[in-house]
Amino acid sequence: MQISHIIKKYDEKTVVNDVSFSLPKGKVTSLIGPNGAGKSTVMSIISRLIAADNGSVVIENKDINKWNSKELSKHLAILTQTNNIQMKLTVEELVAFGRFPHSGGRLNSKDKEMIDKAIDYMELETFRERFIDELSGGQRQRAYIAMVIAQDTEYVLLDEPTNNLDIYHASNLMKIVRRLCDELGKTVILVLHEINYAAFYSDYICAFKDGKIASFGTVEEVITKENLSSIYNVEFEIMQIKGKPLSIYY
């Protein structure tokens, strides 16, 4: 995926300003930065939820705006910050939505196999017949990720997936993200506020400030005292824990 010179304005305010980068295939890339830095807007443009005013996003050598929605949904899946489905659905019914781009609502044996695999992968078998609104926050988030797995796309986009999760469920979710890449070969793009989750579980980090890319590279290249202090305007110290540069800020 290649993002080239994208610009987005709301009225007179430029929220994304000439952003360009490539997403490495089969890797986890996290978008980080302060509130209002433009990272979620970039994610929305990449997933075609909103249109850029200028620039392009290219997937498989084809501009994202030239894909029809059904075909694009076979290549790219997104889980947004708010996923409030206004229907009484079981876990299995929710996960089945992931097969809609493939089946058009008429599930065949291949679709059912993918649904079963996704439920099993996310360890949701005991919740299969439970209604979504009966689940805890962590269980519900796993169900939505199972839906994304069932969709079976190369690119998986997750916008602040750890929002509203406690430490236990958030860390478990990040382990799942890592498995999506390592075990299933997905290219995963996340928006994260928690810098240490980005540092520990990502392969690459794209850091934003004021609508522009402040730093892009491997975790070790981006997570430095100088970079983070400049981006967030607070003091940082970096410690190596299990071979990862984790940050302390104050």
Segments predicted by a language model, with ranges:
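Conserved ABC ATPase signature
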Residues: 131-135, 139
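Conserved ABC transporter NBD signature motif
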Residues: 55-63, 72
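Helix-to-loop junction immediately C-terminal to a conserved catalytic motif
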Residues: 47
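Catalytic Walker B motif of ABC-type/P-loop ATPase nucleotide-binding domains
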Residues: 156-160
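The feature captures the beta-strand-to-loop junction immediately N-terminal to the Walker
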Residues: 32-34
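Conserved ABC ATPase "signature" region
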Residues: 96, 109-127, 152
